[in-house]
Amino acid sequence: MTNGRVPMTPAGEQALRAELSRLKKTERPAIIEAIAEARDHGDLKENAEYHAARERQGIIEGRIKDIESKLSNAQVIDVTKLQANGMVIFGATVTVINVDTEEETTYQIVGEDEADIDNHKISVVAPLARALIKKEVGDEIILDTPKGKVTYEIVDVEYK
């Protein structure tokens, strides 16, 4: 994350581009139409439809600017094209075992916007991801959690 660049996987970039396209081609025109319709209803001071549409327009325009900024600062990293030699890096899929409970979990380390714990995608800035970066299979990490220290062993690293 040097030079203001934001790391992102190719899938993360694709998802942002799809959202941006939807906002510009579908959402923006629909809200412009809704504002025009609400304006036709007369007095704008007491026109709830108009004010709601304007508020929605502000939200959409804000999100468009946010996505455009993220894409312009994105450093797309395709982990399949890197020579990491078994080391955990951004984009890697890492399988760990909780040493105490023997519970095995697999995570992919992704950009902040891509993080989705339900799909086992953790942000590169998350404490677990930061602890895993530059480690290899067989290494153990100790993570401070609200319930105390947890030790994980890295059992697999994939680049997919």
From Swiss-Prot:
Keyword check for Transcription regulation: yes
InterPro entries, per database record: GreA/GreB_C_sf, TF_GreA/GreB_CS, Tscrpt_elong_fac_GreA, Tscrpt_elong_fac_GreA/B, Tscrpt_elong_fac_GreA/B_C, Tscrpt_elong_fac_GreA/B_fam, Tscrpt_elong_fac_GreA/B_N, Tscrpt_elong_fac_GreA/B_N_sf
Domain of life according to the entry: Bacteria
Matches recorded under Pfam families: GreA_GreB, GreA_GreB_N
Record has Chloroplast as a keyword: no
Protein name, entry field: Transcription elongation factor GreA
Family: Belongs to the GreA/GreB family.
GO terms of biological process kind: DNA-templated transcription elongation; regulation of DNA-templated transcription elongation
Keywords tagged on the record: DNA-binding, Transcription, Transcription regulation
Its job: Necessary for efficient RNA polymerase transcription elongation past template-encoded arresting sites. The arresting sites in DNA have the property of trapping a certain fraction of elongating RNA polymerases that pass through, resulting in locked ternary complexes. Cleavage of the nascent transcript by cleavage factors such as GreA or GreB allows the resumption of elongation from the new 3'terminus. GreA releases sequences of 2 to 3 nucleotides.
PROSITE patterns reported for this sequence: GREAB_1
Entries under NCBIfam families matching the protein: greA, PRK00226.1-2, PRK00226.1-4, PRK00226.1-5
One MF annotation (Gene Ontology) recorded for this entry: RNA polymerase binding
Coiled-coil parts of chain: none
